[in-house]
């Protein structure tokens, strides 16, 4: 795969992982409070139902206890006539009518334990609105205040504070149109009008007198005029003589190395060298299978 393709694939995988991670975190943040609220609500309902069941069970046990107490206190002794044929025949036991005085109930038992307080009732409906009140009636005999000594009138009090500004009044009706004004004075003179059309040509005039010839006199010379424009360039002149040769310039930098030259002629053979050291002695190995080594004739082992 190309490097760009790999980078694009890794980038897609990284972005996808980040997006899924964000979605998972948001889902957990939204789901956890909902689940906690649901579990808390169910737990509270179960607790309330358990309390209701316990209260109902206590009420049932209290009723059973009261029934047992009432049955024990209201129990009546019954006598059976033994030896009669009608009792054996299955007609039921017969009570002796002469023993009614002996079957009186016993004394009343002790009062039972006080019952549980009842549940609070529902709030009552709101009452009807009351009747409107009546104005107080005047007493039949008006009570006159006791007479007091007349006093002189006191001085007037200080002027009160100015009241608030009143509301804006309604717009008034439009007034009647005014009378015409007097004529004004004459205005200033206006500007001149446009020139009129040229008139018709006049009649030719009379012939004039003949001219008198007078000697002509020269006038004074005029002032100097401005200089004229620059003229065109003249033709090229002849070439000048050669100048003297200048001094030699400084030495230039060394040039690049040239190519290696051709091989020279072979030199004369050199003198004979000194004799070399004697060579090592020849070997003839003999293999010993027991020791597994190699021995030489000189007794050495390598």
UniProtKB/Swiss-Prot annotation:
Residues 188-197 have a biased composition (Low complexity). GO terms for cellular component: collagen trimer; cuticular extracellular matrix. Residues 108-284 are annotated as: Disordered. Residues 144-159, 247-257, 268-277 have a biased composition (Pro residues). Coiled coil: none annotated. The keyword Disulfide bond applies. Residues 106-135, 154-210, 219-278 are annotated as: Triple-helical region. The keyword Disulfide bond applies. InterPro entries: Col_cuticle_N, Collagen. One of its GO terms (molecular function) is structural constituent of cuticle. It comes from the Eukaryota. Keywords: Collagen, Cuticle, Disulfide bond, Repeat. One of its GO terms (biological process) is cuticle development involved in collagen and cuticulin-based cuticle molting cycle. Transmembrane segments: none annotated. Nematode cuticles are composed largely of collagen-like proteins. The cuticle functions both as an exoskeleton and as a barrier to protect the worm from its environment. Mutations in dpy-13 affects the body shape. PANTHER family: COLLAGEN, CUTICLE COLLAGEN DPY-13. Collagen polypeptide chains are complexed within the cuticle by disulfide bonds and other types of covalent cross-links. Belongs to the cuticular collagen family. This is Cuticle collagen dpy-13. The gene is dpy-13.
């Amino acid at each position: 795969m190309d490097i760009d393709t790999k980078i694009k694939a890794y980038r897609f995988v990284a972005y996808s992982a980040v997006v899924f991670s964000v979605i998972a975190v948001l889902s957990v943040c939204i789901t956890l409070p909902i689940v906690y609220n649901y579990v808390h609500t169910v737990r509270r309902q179960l607790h309330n139902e358990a309390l209701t069941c316990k209260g109902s069970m206590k009420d049932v046990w209290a009723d059973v206890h009261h029934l047992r107490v009432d049955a024990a206190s209201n129990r009546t002794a019954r006598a059976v006539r033994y030896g009669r044929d009608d009792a054996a025949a299955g007609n039921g036991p017969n009570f002796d009518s002469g023993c009614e005085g002996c079957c009186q109930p016993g004394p009343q038992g002790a009062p039972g334990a006080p019952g549980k307080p009842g549940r609070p009732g529902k709030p009552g409906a709101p009452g009807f609105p009351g009747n409107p009140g009546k104005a107080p009636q005047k007493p039949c005999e008006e009570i006159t205040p006791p007479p007091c000594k007349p006093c002189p009138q006191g001085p007037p009090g200080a002027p009160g504070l100015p009241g608030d500004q009143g509301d804006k009044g309604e717009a008034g009706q439009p007034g009647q149109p005014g009378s015409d004004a007097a004529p004004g004075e004459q205005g200033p003179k206006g500007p001149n009008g446009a020139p009129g059309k040229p008139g018709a040509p006049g009649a030719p005039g009379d012939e004039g007198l003949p001219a008198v010839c007078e000697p002509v006199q020269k006038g004074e010379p005029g002032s100097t005029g401005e200089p004229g424009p620059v003229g065109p360039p003249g033709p090229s002149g002849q070439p000048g003589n050669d100048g003297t040769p200048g001094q030699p310039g400084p030495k230039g930098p060394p040039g690049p190395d040239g190519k290696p030259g051709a091989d020279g002629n072979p030199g004369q053979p050199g003198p004979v060298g000194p004799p070399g050291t004697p060579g090592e002695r020849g070997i003839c190995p003999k293999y010993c299978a027991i020791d597994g080594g190699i021995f030489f004739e000189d007794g050495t082992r390598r």
